[in-house]
Every structure is written in C-alpha cells, then in structure tokens.
C-alpha cells in the first residue's frame, strides 16, 4: 500500500486510541537489532488485555537440537491441530514470520507502546545514560528510520487527536537478555550471557496527558497498519536464533504436543529448524497456555543462497486467514432483512434529525453516556462517547461476536446506507440533506411503526 494509505490508517487508529473500556488492552511492538551490524533480528507485536497475555523471547545462542528424525518440508504444509485460533508460520529466504490470532482479540481502540532494543553478546563499556539520535546511530550502527518514524506519520497521528513530537534524546537502559511482554504474568527465565540495550524516548513536552505519546508508539501504529491489524512476529534467519512465544488465551483449546525437526526443500543455505508446540488447557479458569518454540541453526559453513525457497505452515482448521473468514456460527439468515430495513430507516431518521453521523455498530468497548432526543411523538434513546460522537446501537447486532469476521459478514449484506470502517471497527449512517429531511419528516415515524409491527409479527410466527 502507498504511504498515504498508511497515513490514513494511522490517523484513524489514533482517533480511537485508548477508547476501550479496559485500560489494560495494549499492543506492545518490539524491534531488536544486532550489535555491530545494526541488522534487525526481530520485529514483533504482542497483544495483551485483562485476560490475554503474551510473552516473546529471542536467544542467539541456541545450543544443541533435541534428538528427532529430520524431515524435508516443501511449499505448503497443512497441520490441522487448532480449530479456534489462526496459527501460521512462513519461512522464506531470510525471514521467519509467525502469526497467532484469536477471535478473542480486538485491536481496535487499544493503546500502543514501542520498544527499541539492541542485543549484545557482551556488556558494553562507556555507554552514556542519555544519548541523542546521531550518537545512537554511530555507536549501535542503527539507521534513523530504525529509531523514529517519518514526519508524515507523526503528523497523521496528531491529526487523529494524539500529541507527539520528535524526540532528540533517549534514555539508555541495560539488562540481561530476557523475555518481552507480560513477563510478570508468565515469568520465563532470562539469559545472563546476552545483554539488551533499550532506547526510551525522552519527552520534551512541558505538559503531557493521556493523549501524549512518544514517537515509538507512532512507529507501532505504523507497524500495525502494515500488518493489517494482525499482530505477528518476524525473525531474521540470517543467523542462529531461538524464538519462544508464551500465550495465555481466554478459551479452552484441545491439548496438543508437537515436535518437528526439519529442513526446507530448496534452501541451499543449509539451515535446520526445530519446532515445538505445547497447548495446555485449563478447564477451571477457562483458558489455555500455548507455548511455541522455533529454533533456526546454520550448519557451517554457510553456503551462499543460489535459489529462493519458501515454506508456509498452517496449524488451523481454517482454510483462510482468520481476519477475513466468515464464522459459520452466524449464517446470513441470522439477521432478518426485515429487521435490518426497519432499523436502518430508524437510524437514518435519527441521523437526519441530528444532522451528524450516527454509529450503529462498533467493535470498540467504549464508555458511553446515555442521551435522549425528543421528537414530539416519541423519544429516542442514544449514547455518546467522550468525543460527543452519537451511538444508536442495536441489541440484536450486539449478540454477534465482536470481531472482524462480524464486520465482514455485515459488509456482505450490502446495505446501501451503511458506511463500514474496518480500521475504526465501526459502522455508521450519515444524515440526509435538510431539504430531503423536511419532505420525509412526516412519513418516517409512521412508516417505522408499521415496519416494527411487521417485525413483531414475523418473530411471533417464527417462534411458534
């Protein structure tokens, strides 16, 4: 996609920043670079909320492979072990991409945090606690684009009601190589033979509030725009690594244990991979612990790659990416067209009387305040968010799952007056012009009442 599209997505997501009712819903983005070369070892996005927890850990010293029979895998591998999450691994010439997505995840309206780190095999000396960007690029061989996003993306976030300016200095912190994410919940170990250097932007704004963010948060928004909302992890296969991912998912999955030692057909760089998956359900707390480990090891000497190779591994019963597949739990007949026509007419009437957009469905878990619109013959109840946007939500639509599959399903119904915004995770209706509204003012309420009676008759006959 073009940069202008990314700017639009960033502005849209910035406008709903932190609109979830739970302040614990957050996307943490991490960029880990190699000391000496500045090359990127890992970029990852980890989603967590009050129940979903994710931890990722990268090691560069991988040790010895477990004893397993080695296999060659080529092109596409389908392993149906999960029926309720989308889990896939893709390996090409130099990148391994790992993606885990559950329909319990709603990344609309969450806050973003960015974390820039450099991995070192030894502790460095003479590192100042505060450094500017030019010193960081010289000392750690990073490029400026690794540290800060382009100005146009910062401007897009500011148009979306955030407050961000480019920082000039960064606080440098050092620790042993350890897990990233919700470590306090899942508590993996740490590696005392490798060091992580973190670069934290220093705010240069005199006054800050909950809309004030640093540039790495905007970089995280950009990464989510590029990933199409689906958090994933990518690791460079140009060197040894061990990537471990711990997840706590708020649903019960079936117990699974898989170990595979394999090479990729067509890979002339002579790399060996090891994959371990352990899925441990807990029926009492209605959650599942999912542990995934991928090891990449080069069999020296490393030969220069002569031919491209690719391997995709799908571990889900879903035949399509989870963000576009239609959940069979709600077929198209689940929302009657007569009901949709009735409520769409009411929504249009309400929007026209207010002369502003009305949101009729949202994925965002917002804190709303009630309001009333007196129309003489009747009073309509609605809701407002903190930004005075109007909501006229339906209990019937709220019964559908709050995820992007529902958005895709509602989009497929093709109601002409609906404006579906996948980036914001909402559906809205715009008002008609005032001249049209006046001509229809006397007709709408009586027509709506007639349609409501038809709906009641239809439901009554269907329940018999």
From Swiss-Prot:
Signal sequence, start to end: none
Keywords: Host-virus interaction, Inhibition of host innate immune response by virus, Suppressor of RNA silencing, Viral immunoevasion
Keyword Magnesium: no
Entry's Gene Ontology BP terms: symbiont-mediated suppression of host innate immune response
Origin superkingdom: Viruses
KW Cytoplasm (keyword) present: no
Quaternary structure note: Interacts with host MYC2.
UniProt family annotation: Belongs to the tospovirus NS-S protein family.
Role played: Multifunctional protein that plays two independent roles: viral suppressor of host RNAi (VSR) and viral inducer of host attractiveness to insect vectors (VIA). Acts as a suppressor of RNA-mediated gene silencing, also known as post-transcriptional gene silencing (PTGS), a mechanism of plant viral defense that limits the accumulation of viral RNAs. Also inhibits signal transduction by the phytohormone jasmonate, making the infected plant more attractive to aphids, which are the second host to play a role as a dissemination vector. Acts by binding to and inhibiting MYC2 transcription factor.
Protein name as catalogued: Non-structural protein NS-S
């Amino acid at each position: 996609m073009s940069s202008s599209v990314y700017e639009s997505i960033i502005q849209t997501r910035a406008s709903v920043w932190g609109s979830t009712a739970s302040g614990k819903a957050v996307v943490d983005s991490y960029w880990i670079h190699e000391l000496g070369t500045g090359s990127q070892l890992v970029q990852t996005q980890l989603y967590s909320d009050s129940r979903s927890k994710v931890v990722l850990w990268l090691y560069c010293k991988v040790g010895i492979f477990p004893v397993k029979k080695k296999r060659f895998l080529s092109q596409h591998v389908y392993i149906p072990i999960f029926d309720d999450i989308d889990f896939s691994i893709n390996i090409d010439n130099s990148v391994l991409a790992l993606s885990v997505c559950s329909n319990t995840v709603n990344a609309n309206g969450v806050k973003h945090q960015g974390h820039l780190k450099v991995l070192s095999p030894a502790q460095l000396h003479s590192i100042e606690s505060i450094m500017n960007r030019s010193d960081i690029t010289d000392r750690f061989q990073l490029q400026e684009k690794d540290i800060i996003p382009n100005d146009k993306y910062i401007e897009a976030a500011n148009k979306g009601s955030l407050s961000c300016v480019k920082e000039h200095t960064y606080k440098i912190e050092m620790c042993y190589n350890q897990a990233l994410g919700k470590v306090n919940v899942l508590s993996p170990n740490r590696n005392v033979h490798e060091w992580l250097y973190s670069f934290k932007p220093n705010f240069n704004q005199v006054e800050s509030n909950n809309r004030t963010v640093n540039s790495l948060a905007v970089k995280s928004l950009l990464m989510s725009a590029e990933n199409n909302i689906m958090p994933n992890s990518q690791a460079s296969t140009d060197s040894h690594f061990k990537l471990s991912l711990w997840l706590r998912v708020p649903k019960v999955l079936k117990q699974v244990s898989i170990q595979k030692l394999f090479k990729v057909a067509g890979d002339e760089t002579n790399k060996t991979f090891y994959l371990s998956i352990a899925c441990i359900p807990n029926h009492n707390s209605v959650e599942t612990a999912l542990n995934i480990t991928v090891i990449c090891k080069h069999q020296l000497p490393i030969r220069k790659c002569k031919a491209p190779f690719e391997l995709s591994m799908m571990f889900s019963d879903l035949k399509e990416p989870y963000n576009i597949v239609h959940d069979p739990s709600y077929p198209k007949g689940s929302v009657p067209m007569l009901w949709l026509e009735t409520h769409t007419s009411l929504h249009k009437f309400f929007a026209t009387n207010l002369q502003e957009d009305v949101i009729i469905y949202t994925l965002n878990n917002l804190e709303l305040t009630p309001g009333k619109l007196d129309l003489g013959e009747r009073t309509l109840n609605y809701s407002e968010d903190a930004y005075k946007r109007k909501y006229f939500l339906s209990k019937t639509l709220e019964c559908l799952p709050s995820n992007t599959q529902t958005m895709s399903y509602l989009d497929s119904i093709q109601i002409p007056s609906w404006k579906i915004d996948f980036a914001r995770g909402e559906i809205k209706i715009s008002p008609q012009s005032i001249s049209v509204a006046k001509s229809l003012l006397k007709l709408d309420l009586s027509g709506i009442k007639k349609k409501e009676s038809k709906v009641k008759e239809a439901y009554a006959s269907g329940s018999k």
